[in-house]
């Protein structure tokens, strides 16, 4: 954007794209097995998150504004099993889901570019009092939706292999090695154990002890 002040639509579109890329990056370097492996009691998995976000974005920027994408999404059919959009079948490869998400972006961006922010739409599955929407509202909603799921993916990926960070070129984490992080985590565990023994309200106010080499500039308090 060459340093110029962005329009409101450009700003919203930029934040949406940043959230999309942050989410998709979490699949980089993950095997087909690990991409599908359920990491929580409710089955949260990386590939399922991407499949879900790609699918709902197609709906929000498609049919809602009378601009159907033509994508076939059988996991949203009335007779589909619960949570069918939250996991990928054996026949749906990681490449398939990534390609779906890219097509979703392209279709959504055409809607965003061609409509005004006050363009009306209707979300039939929302409550009657709130289902009449504008493109502006759906953009904000989709930014929040994507960012929320990118956060889920961030934690899931860290649980899989320890990879963490906002995006490939900026982890947004203090620059320390695995030893430092192990000491840091151990210090938090000690604080948690101390807090469990502390009466409520706790009279002792303790902060985690800083591992060697930490500084106030990069500590995450």
Regions found by a protein language model. Give the residues of each.
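Short, contiguous alpha-helical
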Residues: 1-2, 9, 13-28, 32-82, ...
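Low-acidity, Ser/Thr- and Arg-rich intrinsically disordered low-complexity segments
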Residues: 200-220
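Long, charge-rich low-complexity segments
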Residues: 92-113, 189-203
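Helix-adjacent hinge/juxtasegments
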Residues: 71-107
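Conserved, well-structured core segments that form or line functional sites
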Residues: 117
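Short, charged, low-complexity loops and linkers
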Residues: 1-12, 86-92, 96
